[in-house]
Amino acid sequence: MIKIAIDVMGGDFAPLEIVKGTLLALNKNKEIHVVLYGNQKLITPLIEKTPFFGNNQITIKHTPYFLRSADKNIRDQLKATPNASLFLALEAAKQDEVQGVVSAGATQTLVLASHLILKKMPLMQRIAIAPMFNSFDNRTRILLDAGANTELKPQHLHTFANYATIIAKEILEIPNPQIKLLNIGTEPTKGRALELETYQLLSQDSNLNFGGNEEPQNLLTTSADILLSDGFTANIALKTYEGTMLNFMNHFKTILTKNLIKKMATKTLFQKPLQQLKNQLDPRQIGGAMLLGLNKIVIKAHGSSQAYAFCQAILQAQKLIKAQVNQKIAHSLESAKNKETQSKQASTKNTAPKTSETTKESQQSL
């Protein structure tokens, strides 16, 4: 049984949609046990009126405290309200009471709280936000870093690329995932110093399937399985994608239901295709974004997540835990560190002066 902590009080539609989504996930997967952190007086009635028969899969940890999105100074909040639902969920993961955490709370709040409580994995220099998104070709892609770091070094992006490659192999079941660098042009000479140096690092790594640069207009049609950039750039790309998809679908629906005749025709002819299109492109359908680089699996569900989207986020966490992604990442980082150490030692050995041979030659000449 995989135990996952749920921040029931985080999100725009908490606790109703969070509880409904959790129960939906438990009905879909009997391997999950959830620990719900939040106000029991609100949680229990929601569980009781929702069809559900696996109560042995639920534990409720009562707390009346939760974090509001306006709360900015996490260190102060952690001292003032250590029993807030999010903090308790993360603390449970730290103490190995659960194997992962899912929250729809504010992104920066979750990132900072996770960093303070769970800490980064050994050898991991930065945390990254890595959402998945769908496209017209029914492929799921990974975008990172989508907002954890506005400024990064090439070495950080290189590490993220290796991390995302393992996730694409284990979760998306892509044997040899391709990585591309989000940039303003496809030529290797395009971009800032960050992109230029990262391009060189990725090109030289034989363990990565690097496909070069990718322009933003190809976000939905790229051959890449993983798109890489700093948190500022990737976050803008992600929000542009999300806003475009939601507005497109809403506007398209408005056109097709503008009058009674169109509404009847749409219901008769286009209802099923429209639902398929929504499932294909709606960013809320995919689940959540992974917080990469932490000692435990943490999933950031969309702030506006309703039941189905939150359910997907929980199932996503379960897959990552079951696949032992963190353990494989730790092994990959350790192997890379060992190779780097061996390379430096070999380089030092080759450049060291051959003292004994030099002395012998000097004595012979005398």
From Swiss-Prot:
Gene Ontology MF annotations: phosphate:acyl-[acyl carrier protein] acyltransferase activity
Cellular component, GO, one term: cytoplasm
Transmembrane segments: none
Keywords: Cytoplasm, Lipid biosynthesis, Lipid metabolism, Phospholipid biosynthesis, Phospholipid metabolism, Transferase
Region feature (Disordered): 334-366
EC code: 2.3.1.274
Name of the protein in question: Phosphate acyltransferase
